[in-house]
Amino acid sequence: MEKFTIEANQVLSKDVVSFFHCDYTGMGKENNPNYLNVVKNDNGTNRTDYRGVHMDLSDACKMLEDVLLKDLSQLRNILGKNVTICSIPRSKAENKYKPSQLMLKKIISKVSRQLGFEDGTGYITRTVDTQTTHLKFRVQNGKSPYKGITKDTCILSDNIKGKIILLIDDIYTKTVNIDEDCLQALLDEGAKSVYFYAIGRTV
């Protein structure tokens, strides 16, 4: 796990201390965390056979859980246990997905509780579709990223107020601003402080 800074920009009002597990170089490339794409289960078949990657959903979920257990244990030592874990919602309204397509959120919730964090994975719920940004060509099924999109398309819990929050996403890409906007939304909702963690960081 490595530390970096998400810098303030036109979307985010302050720098945010952040962490990531490994580089994300592209599906099928050497040493890439391909399990992140498999966990999304976009095809709904519980298996991925694409760009030389052949993996079942269950195997991908186990890989993800192992990484989260390792890294969040370290973050508990760095940030303390008095932290609430929140997760970036998927791009479409949550009720548009099958349970098997929401495994990232489920695993983050499981690991958070196992390590003694407050489970806030239900504190940000997408209710309006936005564009799918992880695909090579964005799926035009909703609004593209813009300042304030999180508050416009999600319900944010009142429980955010006053909390120290670690926001988790699967992949961080600097130019997209989805994570920056969500961090700002948490601050606007009264979070005491915010940190960020991603499994993969796009290079």
What are these regions (language model features)?
Residues 84-85, 115-125:
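A short coil-to-beta-strand element that immediately follows conserved catalytic motifs
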Residues 1-84, 91-98, 125-161, 200-202:
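Active-site-facing substrate-recognition patch
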Residues 120, 164, 192-195:
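Residues at the starts of beta-strands that form the adenosine-phosphate
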Residues 151-152, 172, 177-179, 197-203:
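Accessory, usually C-terminal, subdomains that scaffold auxiliary metal cofactors
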Residues 100-106:
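Charged helix-capping and loop-helix junction motifs
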Residues 159-167, 171-172, 180-188:
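Long C-terminal interaction/binding lobes of large macromolecular proteins
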Residues 86-88, 168, 197:
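Short hydrophobic segments within beta-strands
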Residues 183-203:
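A short, conserved beta-to-alpha structural element at the edge of catalytic cores
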